[in-house]
Amino acid sequence: MKNMIFSANISKALCLATVGITLMMPAQVAAATPAMAVETQAVNEQGGITVFPNKEAQYRIPAIVECKSGKLIAFTDHRYHNQDIGGGRHLDIVMKTSMDKGATWSSPEQMVAKGGNGIATSFDCAHGDAAVVVDKKSGRILLMCASGGIGYWESKRGHLLMMGRYYSDDEGKTWYGEEVTKQIYDLMPEVESAFFTSGRICQSKQIKVGKYYRIYTVLCTRSGNRILYSDDFGQNWKVLGKNVAEAAPRGDEAKVEELPNGNVLLSSRAMGGRHINIYTYEDKKTATGSWGKVIASDAKNMGVAAHKNSCNGEVLMVDAKKNGKKVKLLLQSVPVGPGRNNVGIYYKALETPADYATPEAIAKNWEGCYQLSNTTSAYSTMVQGKNGSIYFLLEENAFKNPKTQTDDYYDIRFYDLSIEQITNHKYK
């Protein structure tokens, strides 16, 4: 099966050709037979908007939700010391809103979770890496995050990287939060450092035990991924699967998505692509089941290829049509590369149960990739709006002062995309 990358311009396509992707002009596509093809498409037509400009502050780590009213909320870290949580550094989680589907955004930034007390062992030293979901029925917003002033590599029992939980019941106008460090670490006695992967928390469309539909999120730990679920919208969490340590033993930041049969797809950050696994339910109500064998998805199996980079991205399943036939379409965003450059969205249809029966089936033979960015770009996330649009938020245009700053920070940019755009009109 051929993969096709729809690139923003010829110069970018030439760059992709250097990473082992065969370059072809559009007129040559039908007659040629390479593994991957590049076709031109102007990125500026997509109308990207800078929500958080890097000239105003040191921004990183995007998340986005659509509220019940249609209001959009974009979240990011405001990093005052140009680095992640640790060493007592100050980070806040901030937000902006849009009432017109992303055409315009509020200003200035609004505070969600404020840090800055300078005490590394205090919960309110810093907050970052927002993972967010809106409950489909009530409209309540849940945000899980990393907190405190102890870093991921410094963390150990008795001196832990902390965790926070925030709720809003008025579409982000007000927030109330609390520390949940003990509650989460008590689920995993073997883990000494963990944080919630930023971006989208997945809510089930099928499984409802009690008042809420089930939600899923993934912890990044130094011993691989730990997948959690909650049946009360984040008040209490449980580990998904007795063999959860086998889900992705080398996993990094990861996302989950619900498959058409209710099983859970794990897509974890990896050098060169993703690590893929599936949790197969025995009993959905009690959440019993088991994880399969993790499989790499990368250029070797015509999967999700992230050349010379390992980066957080989003996995999302949407309803689509091909020639009038309904299909489930799986999307995965990553920097196409080389390095943290050229963020794109890979796609593949799940047309039959065999297409998502095993991790291997999902990992291989992705159909194509829409390259959205033609510059430095890294973390990305997306949700599908009520109108069918794919609301996409990413880090773009890296910047740092090499004399005074150790890490890049970015513009946080928004794109309103359609399934037709992403798939070059193959699906709609």
Tell where the protein language model's regions lie, with residue ranges.
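Asp-box/BNR beta-propeller blade signature and adjacent active/binding-site loops
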Residues: 33-428
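Bacterial N-terminal signal peptides that target proteins for export
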Residues: 2-15
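Bacterial N-terminal signal peptides
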Residues: 13-26
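A general, composition-driven signal for non-globular sequence regions
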Residues: 6, 20-22, 90
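Sec-dependent signal peptide cleavage junction
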Residues: 26-33
